[in-house]
Design a protein with these regions (language model features):
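Loop/helix-junction capping segments adjacent to catalytic residues or to phosphate/diphosphate-binding pockets
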Residues: 12, 20-23, 47-48, 80-81, ...
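Rossmann-fold NAD(P)-binding glycine/threonine-rich loop
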Residues: 16-37, 48, 53-56
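C-terminal substrate-binding/catalytic lobe of Rossmann-fold NAD(P)-dependent oxidoreductases
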Residues: 65-190
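Short, ordered loop/turn segments at secondary-structure junctions
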Residues: 17-20, 42-44, 74-76
Length: 190
């Protein structure tokens, strides 16, 4: 990164928890000192599209209070955080658009050995986000709206890491010609 800085290039970051620790400082540096940073919890083009669909569906579901929403994310056994940064970003997209939900809560966690801890029981204004750790799964995110009559389910299933790599390259190219605090919503304006 020192080489990038010495050449005046911006940074492209994907690191869980990093923005919680450094987000305000990075936004300030971009705004006040002309720095450039492209940050995302997930660089996959498919996840960017899925996120837009997720937000739109949440807006629609405001008109249908008999549907309750939940999420399950599945990742490889080496992933340490639960829920994933992508799941948190998707949950925040729902909370921004679905008036009856005010916060997400950790649901169940299925460990690599099959042990399940936690619960999906929560207050009516909360949305459970559950996590499964199994095999070498790159990432699956499923959002479910459930009623007594039926279910509406949307899923993004990463088959490999190619989509993440493509998105990171597109973000780097975008950063070369744009300034400030940037993200996937700047790169893809759905």
């Amino acid at each position: 990164r020192d080489v990038e800085r010495s050449r005046g290039l911006g940074d492209v970051y994907k690191r869980q928890g990093w923005m919680g620790e450094h987000g305000e400082e990075m936004r300030r540096l971009c705004a006040e000192e002309g720095k450039t940073l492209f940050w995302s919890s997930n660089f996959s083009l498919g996840v960017a599209i899925f996120s837009a669909v997720n937000k739109y569906l949440a807006k629609i579901m405001n008109n249908f209070p008999n549907y309750d929403v939940s999420m399950v994310e599945t990742h490889h056994i080496h992933k340490l955080d639960a829920p994933s940064g992508t799941a948190i970003t998707l949950a925040e997209g729902i909370l921004e658009n679905l008036d009856r939900k005010n916060k997400w809560v950790m649901g169940t966690l299925t460990a690599p050995d099959g042990t399940v801890t936690g619960t999906t029981a929560c207050a009516s204004d909360e949305m459970p986000v559950s996590a499964i750790r199994e095999g070498e799964v790159p990432g699956i995110h499923t959002i479910r709206y459930e009623s007594e009559a039926d279910s509406i389910i949307i899923t993004h299933d990463a088959k490999n890491r190619k989509g993440f790599a493509l998105g990171a390259v597109l973000a780097a190219e975008y950063t070369a010609t744009h300034e400030g605090f940037l993200g996937m919503n700047d790169l893809f304006q759905f």
